[in-house]
C-alpha cells in the first residue's frame, strides 16, 4: 500500500473483489468444477479504499438513516453496469469515465474487469483552460464548453475554445497513455474504447 499511496501509515479496507478469469492449462473456463489440469490460473480484481473515506461514507449514511450496503470503486461500478449480470459475457472494451476532476479507466476483457486506473484530469481541467485562455469566469467557460457545437456560437469564439480544449486534450491523452501502460499484465488491450 505504501508503494501505491506514498504513505506507509494509511489504513485501507477491501471494497471490491471479483473473479476476473479462470484458466486451466491455458483455456478459459467459467466454472472450474469438473475440470482437470496441471496449470490453474485465477485472476481476481481487488480495490481498496482508505478507512477515513469509508468512515465518512458510513457517517453520511448513518446521519441520513440509510444502510450502507456496499462501497465500490467507481470504474468497477461503471464496468459492472455495462456488463450487467451476465457471468458468461465476452464483452471486451476500455471504459473511460471522464468526471469533473478525474478520469477513471477500466479494462474489461471477456467480461472480466482486468483492472482500473485513475488520473487527475477531468472536465474541470478543460473548463479552467478555456477560462484562462479566453479570460472568462469558470461559469462562462463551462457554458462555452457545454455548447461548443451550438449553431449560435461565433466561429471565432469556437476556434479559440477548440484551441484551449486541444491544449488540455494533449495532456489528457498522455494521462490515458500512461494509465493504459500500467496494464502490463494484460496480454492485449481491447480495440474498443467507450467514453462515459
Stretches with model-predicted labels:
Residues 67, 135-137:
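Helix N-cap / loop-to-helix initiation motif
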